Amino acid sequence: MNNLRQEFIKFSVETGVLRFGEFVTKAGRTSPYFFNAGLFNQGRTLAMLAEFYAQTLIDSGIEFDMLFGPAYKGITLASATAVALANKGRDVSFAFNRKEAKDHGEGGTMVGAKLQGRVVIIDDVISAGTSVRESVDMIRAAGATPCAVMIALDRMERSGADGALSAHSAVQEVSNTYGMPVVSIGNLSDLFEYLSNAGADSEQAKYKEAVAAYRQRYGVA
């Protein structure tokens, strides 16, 4: 058991970011759980989340020079992770993009440090991979090298519509397409382990079978 990963799942449940019930995903699937990183919306919880990002990135052993946060959620995540890394003795620069180009002041769509060297893309989740693709294009256009993607939760489920499911997840497809690792703080296996270790009388324990069935239907190895 990776204690950091289990601590993250527990933290997400306690803050209401990870909820159990019946939810419809972007892909139209009925999921027994829902993860909404936008609910890390207080200073304390954001600081704790950034600690998880920073420590997981350090533990991964990935060599990198700076962070990039795609608009919009990635902006806060990359900024906070840079602060957490600095608190751990690793001072790195960060940048992010605007959705709309600015025609005054510094102009353009990029904000923050100049993109250079090996860049880690920081985001919350990967659904269709659109945000990653756009980030990779921007980083390469600046002459830098995207070296990894860091996300909070990997749902570990196959892409595509029912009846035409891919053999791979969106995370695996991103990794295969761009030849770089996608590192997550937690994933579906960690979530299931959390439910398996929950007391029989706990509120979460009753969702174990639903999550198992969902993983059986949509999960990847």
Curated annotation (Swiss-Prot):
| InterPro entries cross-referenced by the UniProt entry | OPRT, Or_phspho_trans_dom, PRibTrfase_dom, PRTase-like
A single Gene Ontology CC annotation of this entry is:
cytoplasm
Which superkingdom is the protein from?
A: Bacteria
Task: Detail which positions bind 5-phospho-alpha-D-ribose 1-diphosphate.
Answer: 26, 72-73, 98-99, 102, 104, 123-131
Q: Which UniProt keywords apply?
A: Glycosyltransferase, Magnesium, Pyrimidine biosynthesis, Transferase
Q: Which Pfam families match?
A: Pribosyltran (PF00156)
Which pathway is it part of? Answer: Pyrimidine metabolism; UMP biosynthesis via de novo pathway; UMP from orotate: step 1/2
- Gene Ontology annotations of biological process type: 'de novo' pyrimidine nucleobase biosynthetic process; 'de novo' UMP biosynthetic process; pyrimidine ribonucleoside biosynthetic process
- PROSITE patterns, alphabetically? PUR_PYR_PR_TRANSFER (PS00103)
Source organism (scientific name): Janthinobacterium sp. (strain Marseille)
Protein name (record): Orotate phosphoribosyltransferase
Q: Which residues bind orotate?
A: F34, F35, S127, R155
